[in-house]
Each structure stands twice: as structure tokens, then as C-alpha cells.
Amino acid sequence: INKDCLLPMDVGRCRASHPRYYYNSSSKRCEKFIYGGCRGNANNFHTLEECEKVCGVR
């Protein structure tokens, strides 16, 4: 699995409201979260499809 997918979900420090997806290593699924718009980490994908492709979800 891509190491970025193992990072914890991080909403970032800003207060915007961007719908994004992250890989949840507990459920082994990509799940939606609201990204604040700055900082955060690499476990942050624009689409469910991108998250599933990068993180190998079947």
C-alpha cells in the first residue's frame, strides 16, 4: 500500500469547506471528509476514484 494512504486523516488548519476523500486504514476504505484548505497531509484526494486507485481499494 502507498505510504501516504497510511497517514491519519487531517482536516488542516484553515476553515474552508472542501469535500475530499482519505483512506481509512481501519475500515480499508476511502471515506469522505471536509478539508479546511491548507496544510493537512498527502492522504487527501479530490475524488473517491483517485483515492481508491492510489490506495489499492477493490
Swiss-Prot record:
<comment type="function">
    <text>Dual-function toxin that inhibits both the serine protease trypsin (Kd&lt;30 nM) and voltage-gated potassium channels Kv1.2/KCNA2 (IC(50)=2800 nM).</text>
</comment>
<keyword id="KW-0964">Secreted</keyword>
<feature type="disulfide bond">
    <location>
        <begin position="14"/>
        <end position="38"/>
    </location>
</feature>
<dbReference type="GO" id="GO:0005615">
    <property type="term" value="C:extracellular space"/>
</dbReference>
<comment type="similarity">
    <text>Belongs to the venom Kunitz-type family. Sea anemone type 2 potassium channel toxin subfamily.</text>
</comment>
<dbReference type="GO" id="GO:0042151">
    <property type="term" value="C:nematocyst"/>
</dbReference>
<feature type="disulfide bond">
    <location>
        <begin position="5"/>
        <end position="55"/>
    </location>
</feature>
<dbReference type="InterPro" id="IPR036880">
    <property type="entry name" value="Kunitz_BPTI_sf"/>
</dbReference>
<keyword id="KW-0166">Nematocyst</keyword>
<keyword id="KW-0646">Protease inhibitor</keyword>
<dbReference type="InterPro" id="IPR002223">
    <property type="entry name" value="Kunitz_BPTI"/>
</dbReference>
<keyword id="KW-0800">Toxin</keyword>
<keyword id="KW-1015">Disulfide bond</keyword>
<keyword id="KW-0872">Ion channel impairing toxin</keyword>
<feature type="disulfide bond">
    <location>
        <begin position="30"/>
        <end position="51"/>
    </location>
</feature>
<keyword id="KW-1220">Voltage-gated potassium channel impairing toxin</keyword>
<keyword id="KW-0632">Potassium channel impairing toxin</keyword>
<dbReference type="Pfam" id="PF00014">
    <property type="entry name" value="Kunitz_BPTI"/>
</dbReference>
<keyword id="KW-0722">Serine protease inhibitor</keyword>
<feature type="domain" description="BPTI/Kunitz inhibitor">
    <location>
        <begin position="5"/>
        <end position="55"/>
    </location>
</feature>
<dbReference type="InterPro" id="IPR050098">
    <property type="entry name" value="TFPI/VKTCI-like"/>
</dbReference>
<dbReference type="InterPro" id="IPR020901">
    <property type="entry name" value="Prtase_inh_Kunz-CS"/>
</dbReference>
<dbReference type="GO" id="GO:0090729">
    <property type="term" value="F:toxin activity"/>
</dbReference>
<dbReference type="GO" id="GO:0015459">
    <property type="term" value="F:potassium channel regulator activity"/>
</dbReference>
<protein>
    <recommendedName>
        <fullName>KappaPI-actitoxin-Avd3b</fullName>
    </recommendedName>
</protein>
<dbReference type="GO" id="GO:0004867">
    <property type="term" value="F:serine-type endopeptidase inhibitor activity"/>
</dbReference>
<feature type="site" description="Reactive bond for trypsin">
    <location>
        <begin position="15"/>
        <end position="16"/>
    </location>
</feature>
